[in-house]
A protein has these predicted regions:
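Catalytic cores of the polymerase beta-like nucleotidyltransferase superfamily
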Residues: 1-440
Length: 440
C-alpha cells in the first residue's frame, strides 16, 4: 500500500522494502509473523507498526488507522480502524492513498477510492481531502509535498500550492530534526533544482533556510544570471551532472549554498561594478550557523562549510602560475574533500561566454594535472613534517608543551613550501628556526 504501490506504478519499486496495512492489531501481527519471519522488531507499536525481514526483504506492517490531531503539535491521537478506506483517506497525498488487496489465494484487487492513479499519471501532487485540513493535521506534509516535487519531478496541484503558501508558517510546529530529514530527501532528489525552486516559491524556504531565497537580492557580478540565486540553481544542476553514482548530499548542499555569503558582502565599487570580497569566508560561517540550527551531523556541517570556504581558491590559479607549494596547500586544505571540490569548482563555471568558460576549464584541467604530477613524487594526502614530535624534543632539548607544537607547525609549513626534505635538511632548518626563536 501507499508508497509501495506508487513506486510500483512508476517502475521505481524496491523489492527489498515493502509496506503493508491490515485490520489485525499489532499484537496479532507479531503473533502471525513468528515462525515465518527471520527477525521481527517494534518500529512503533503505539502507532500500530511492526517490521520484519525474510530472505533479505524488509516489510513494514501497520494496522488500519483513523487518527485525529490536536492541532498544536503534529502528534496524532492514534486510533486503530477496521476499514481500509478510512486508513487511505488519512494519507498525505492521493498518490499515496492506493492499495493492492492480496487475498489468501494470492489474488489481487487494486483499491483507489481517492483518484490516486489519476493524480499519479498526471504528475500532480494533491491531497485526498482539502489541503488546509491535511496540513493543519500535520504541517510537515507541506514540506513532504515539495520533497516529492524533487524526487518524482511532479508539480503541486493549484490548491495544494495555494494552501502551502497560505499556511507555510505552520511549519514552525515541526521539530527541526523532521524538517532536516525531509530537506535531505529533497536535496538528493532527481529533480532537486525544481524542488528548491518550489521550496522558495511556497515561502517554506524563508522559514526553514532563508539564506537561499535571500540570494535573490544579490545581482550576479558576471551578469550571466538574473541574480545569485539563479546562478546557484545552475551550479546545483551542473554539480548533479558531475556526480559519480549515488547522489552526493554534501556536494549538493555546497553547490546550492556556495554563494550565500554574497548578499552580506555586496559592495558597489566606484567604477560602477559590484564586489563580494571574502564572501566565501562569510558564507562558510553562515553555513555552519544554519546547519547547526537544523541539527545536522557535525561531519556534514564541516564538510559543506569547508567546501564553501574553498570554492574560490582556484580562481587565484591562472596560466600555471601557482607554485608547487600553492598546489600542495590546495590539496592539503581540501583533504578528503578534494574530489568534491573539483566537482564544485567545475560546476561553478556558469558563464555563457564560451571563450571564458573554455579557459576556466582548461586552467582547472591544468591544475589537476599538476596535482597528479606532484602526487607521483610524494603522498599529497598525508603531507606531514619530516620530523615528528619526539625528534623535535630530542633535537631542541624541549619538554612536551606548546613550543613543540609551534616547531611542528613550522616544519609542516616548510614541508608544504619545499616538498620532501632529507632528515639532515629538516634538522638543519629546525635548528636555524630555533636559534631565531630564542633571539626574538
Amino acid at each position: 500500500m501507499g508508497g509501495s504501490v506508487r513506486d510500483a506504478v512508476l517502475g521505481r519499486l524496491s523489492t527489498g522494502d515493502l509496506d503493508f496495512t491490515t485490520d489485525a492489531r499489532p499484537e496479532q501481527v507479531q503473533e502471525l509473523l513468528r515462525g515465518w519471519a527471520e527477525a521481527i522488531w517494534d518500529t512503533g507499536i503505539e502507532f500500530g507498526t511492526i517490521s520484519a525481514v525474510r530472505a533479505g526483504i524488509q516489510i513494514e506492517i501497520t494496522t488500519f488507522r483513523a487518527d485525529s490531531y490536536d492541532r498544536v503539535s503534529r502528534n496524532p491521537q492514534v486510533r486503530f480502524g477496521d476499514r481500509l478506506e478510512d486508513d487511505l483517506v488519512r494519507r498525505d497525498f492521493s498518490m499515496n492513498a492506493m492499495a493492492v488487496k492480496i487475498g489468501a489465494d494470492g489474488s489481487q484487487e487494486f483499491i483507489d477510492p481517492l483518484g490516486g492513479m489519476d493524480a499519479l499519471l498526471a504528475g500532480v501532487i494533491d491531497t485526498p481531502a482539502a489541503p488546509e485540513d491535511s496540513f493543519n493535521d500535520d504541517p510537515l506534509r507541506m514540506l513532504r509535498g515539495v520533497r516529492f516535487v524533487s524526487q518524482l519531478g511532479f508539480s503541486l496541484s493549484p490548491r495544494v500550492f495555494a494552501a502551502t503558501v497560505e499556511m507555510a508558517g505552520q511549519i514552525e510546529r515541526i521539530t527541526v530534526e523532521r524538517i532536516a530529514a525531509e530537506l535531505d530527501k529533497l536535496i538528493v532528489g532527481e529533480h532537486a533544482v525544481e524542488g528548491v525552486e518550489t521550496l522558495c516559491e511556497t515561502g517554506l524556504a524563508e522559514l526553514i533556510i532563508p539564506e537561499i531565497p535571500g540570494m535573490k537580492l544579490a545581482i550576479d557580478e558576471h551578469h550571466q544570471h538574473k541574480d545569485v540565486y539563479t546562478h546557484s540553481l545552475t551550479v546545483l544542476a551542473q554539480a548533479m551532472d558531475l556526480e559519480d553514482g549515488d547522489p552526493d548530499l554534501v556536494l549538493r548542499w555546497a553547490a546550492i549554498l556556495h554563494d550565500i555569503g554574497k548578499p552580506a558582502t555586496r559592495r558597489h565599487e566606484p567604477n560602477g561594478g559590484v564586489s563580494f570580497h571574502h564572501h566565501e569566508v562569510v558564507g562558510a560561517k553562515m553555513v555552519r550557523k544554519r546547519l547547526r540550527a537544523l541539527k545536522y551531523p557535525k561531519a556534514v556541517i564541516e564538510d559543506v562549510a569547508n567546501l564553501v570556504f574553498l570554492h574560490l581558491r582556484f580562481h587565484g590559479y591562472a596560466d600555471n602560475q601557482w607554485t608547487d607549494s600553492a598546489v600542495r596547500r590546495y590539496v592539503t586544505d581540501a583533504g578528503p574533500l578534494l574530489p568534491r571540490l573539483h566537482k564544485l569548482v567545475r560546476a561553478d563555471c556558469t558563464t555563457r561566454n564560451k571563450r571564458r568558460a573554455r579557459k576556466l576549464q582548461q586552467n582547472y584541467d591544468n591544475l589537476e594535472q599538476r596535482i597528479a604530477r606532484i602526487a607521483e613524487q610524494e603522498d599529497l594526502a598525508k603531507v606531514r613534517p619530516d620530523l615528528d614530535g619526539n625528534t623535535i624534543m630530542e633535537l631542541l632539548d624541549l619538554p612536551p608543551g606548546p613550543m613543540v607544537g609551534k616547531a611542528w607547525r613550522y616544519l609542516k609549513e616548510l614541508r608544504l613550501d619545499r616538498g620532501p626534505m632529507s632528515r639532515e635538511e629538516a634538522e638543519e632548518s629546525l635548528r636555524q628556526w630555533w636559534a631565531a626563536e630564542q633571539q626574538s
